[in-house]
Every structure is written in structure tokens, then in C-alpha cells.
Amino acid sequence: MGILFNRKAVGCSLLVFIKGRELIVLDVLSEGLLTEEEKLKRNGLLARKPYIAKKLANISAMEARGEISPIIRLEKSYLCNFQCTHCSAEYYMDRHLDKVLHVTDDRKKIDIAKIKDISKEADELGLARFVITGGEPLVMRDLDEVVAAIDPEKHYVIVDTNGWFLDDDKAKHLKSIGVEKIQLSLDSLVEEEHDDFRNKPGSYKRVMRAIDSTVNAGLNLLLSTVLIRGQPKTQAFLDLCQFATDRNVGLYVSYAKPTGSCTDHPEFVITKEDADILRQLESKYKVFTHMTPSYGSFKGCITVKGIITVTSTGEITPCPYIDFSIGNLYENSLKEILDRGMRNPWLGPHRPDCLIGEDPKFIKIHTEKTTGAKHLPLPWGQGFSGDDSLID
């Protein structure tokens, strides 16, 4: 029979097992479960990469045991051909350090050997998903080596890109080296709006080309967009949701948060009303956020338990938008750092709201501590620490 487990989560009872090379899903009692399309995709993965498919199928069993299986975002390089208005990584980039802060970053950087170590540790913990991000991965000269170091036979590899360099040849190449999914940034179907938001004339045409190239290469596709204040009420946003739904492609919506370049644009940060409207749209369109229940599981805020980021200096942050480290991989093992994060009162307990997007107390602490910092993220002890408390 292979892997057999019973999963009970919020409103869900799910029995999953692997028989031969087929993923079987039984006894589904809730919404948001595996669609026929999703089952076909997973069965295809099982045929091509059975080891990864079995790890993905085992995530529910891990959660039932109280274990975590976060997606690992890997930021080896912050080099980027765009300078987006809302970029959360801008303050990590050499151009910002050089031109704005007039400093250099002499911290030790992760290399291919270290990425191999991270991949091995992650595999030993049962983790299965890596997102190569940055920066812009497709400007990295060593992208092929990074993919190989992660090991696409052991981990599901996703590339997060603005699409500028993603043509037919590049998409086919990414498929050939083991990449499984492309996450493409698309902020508006109005060409001028998208180009202005990305500060890159021509970027709309390039990302539309990239959508076709991704699909034609047989890669899985996810569209991502940044939601700013008031946007859920606009026809332009509804058109974007409809565009994704018509193409049967998921649209991942990231809230604009008060970090990175958005600290200069407080008017971008969404309101509770925006978030509530978006939740209503989830029932009509193929749109979701990091807070959306999936396959019957509702983690709430996914810090540590659902996602982590490995920065170019080996720091691990519990969220792409939180500039506090929970440990450095040159000082501690991945397991030690994850355990530390889950013990932290801000990060470990279930919370129904987005910590950096909706919690005023934490946002205030984060803003005060990161303001004026020359190097991010703040290391363990300066941002998060063992003395953290939710009580004043």
C-alpha cells in the first residue's frame, strides 16, 4: 500500500495512500480539497518523480503528528533587472546598500556547497518544496547549478520570476533541468498600470509572453500579484481574477505590507475591509492568499510552519516580509532553527491574522527595530529573541 495515513484538520477528514504509481484520495468531507486536475498533476508527478510525490503526500501526516513542512524560499542573489515600487527585498540589494546607505555587505554568503547542505537537511526533515527567488532568478548565471544543488529529484522546485527573460527556449530549458513550476508576477491587465507598478516599460508584454511559454513547455503555472489598498473593489482587479480563472490558473495574492520599498508607500498597505472582500472573492475565482485554507487545512498565519526564507547570508526568516532572523545556517542546523521559531510566542502558536500585515503591535515593533538598520534581516537576538513575550 505504501504511505497510509488519516488526516483530521479543521472541517476535514482525508485518507490518502499511494498504490503503485497512483495517488489515491478518499473520504473527503470538506471544501478546498484535491480537484480532479490536481489529482492528475500529482499522479503525473508520481510517475516522473515518485520520491517527491510521496513526500508531498506525506505532508498531511506530518501535520497530523504536529510536525511542520514549510516551503523553503531560497534567496541566493538579490540581483534584479526591475526596481518595483512595492519590493520587499529592495533593502537587501547591493544597489540599495551602495547608492542609499553607502555601505557594503561583508557577511558570509551561501554558495552551491551550502545549498547542497540545506537540501540534505531539508530532505532529512521530510521537507519537499523549494522556491528560488531573489532578486530575479533568471539573471543568475549559476541558476542551473542552484537547481542541481537543491536536487530536483528530491525536492519540488519552483522559480519565482518577473517573466522578462522567460521565452520559449528558457521555459523548455527550465523544464529540462528539473524545475516543476513557474510563479509569474502580474499586477494588472492594463498594460500601463502593470508597467508603472513594476517601473519597467514593456514588462506587461514580457509577462504575457512568459505565460504562454510556461504552459507550452509543460511547466505548472502560478500567477502572483500584490494587493494594495482599495484594489479589491476595482473592476481592474476583478478582471485580473477572471483572467486567471478563465485560464484555470491560480492567482496568488500577496498583501502589500509595511516592509521594504512599501515603507515609503504607507498608502499601499491594505485595510481589514480589503482582506475581507478578497476572502469573499475566493469563493468565485481561482484566487488565494497565504491565509487561505487549502485541502481542508487552515494554518492561519504561516510563519515557520508554512514558509521560511533562506537569505543570501544564511539567515532564516519566518516570512518573506519579516526582517527578523530566527537563526543562521552557519551557526545552527535547520532543525534547531525551525524548533526555535516554533517556540517563539509570535510565530509558533496559531493566529488567524497575518502577523506582519494585520497585527498593529508587531508591525510597530518591526518598524521601530528595522528603521535605520544597514543590514537585514536583523540577526537573532536583535529582532526576535528568546526573551520575546506577547505581554507588555
Predicted feature locations:
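Flexible mid-to-C-terminal extensions adjoining Fe-S/redox cofactors in radical SAM and related proteins
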Residues: 7, 12, 28-29, 34-35, ...
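Processing junctions and N-termini across compartments
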Residues: 74, 78-81, 295, 313, ...
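Short cysteine clusters
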Residues: 80, 84-87, 301, 319, ...
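Short loop/turn microsegments at loop-to-beta-strand junctions
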Residues: 72, 304-306
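Radical SAM enzyme [4Fe-4S]-AdoMet core and its adjacent flexible, acidic
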Residues: 2-15, 19, 23, 176-177, ...
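Conserved alpha-helical substructure of the radical SAM core
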Residues: 5-7, 27-180
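Generic structural signal for helix capping and beta-alpha/helix-loop junctions
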Residues: 94, 139, 167, 191, ...
